[in-house]
């Protein structure tokens, strides 16, 4: 039986020498791989009490939406700044070469709601940390952070210390 990592394309020396790029598009392009990825992520949510699934732009949408559908939960978009039409709150965070800003609608999370945050990959943890801070600012509680792939060598879990973090596939390097 194939595992999710069997569907992940690994590209050496991209975007720079010494890096192995883990390409999730190869998972999405295979019906069996996509189904397996969603099923494995859903298994990591067994026993998790949540009210809302939220996904980080853009691949968090790809994996978060089917999970919300399976669990019969609403789905909330965490978007790059300037993409949401209604009143938002925003959070800036550090990137390797600069900063980025994400935002969420002010009415997307109600006080006391239990939220699962979803993204395709955890690297440094900056995006998901900022997303968690937005949820908490609105009065929500982050009960799980869920990723298809984790690049353990980039130590994103340290940034997310105190949160329940789950990953389907863990690669030890960067």
List where the protein language model places each region:
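Active-site-facing substrate-recognition patch
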Residues: 1-50, 100
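PRPP-dependent phosphoribosyltransferase catalytic core
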Residues: 6-7, 130-174
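Residue-level signature of catalytic and energy-coupling elements of molecular machines
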Residues: 18, 53, 75, 145
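Short glycine-rich phosphate-binding loop at a beta-alpha junction
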Residues: 49-57
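Conserved acidic residues
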Residues: 51, 113, 143
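Short Gly/Thr/Asp-enriched flexible loops that form oxyanion-binding sites at enzyme active sites
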Residues: 62-71
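Short, glycine/charge-rich flexible loops or terminal/linker lids adjacent to PRPP-binding catalytic cores
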Residues: 74-116
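Conserved G/P- and acidic residue-centered "switch" motifs that form tight phosphate/ATP-binding loops
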Residues: 120, 125
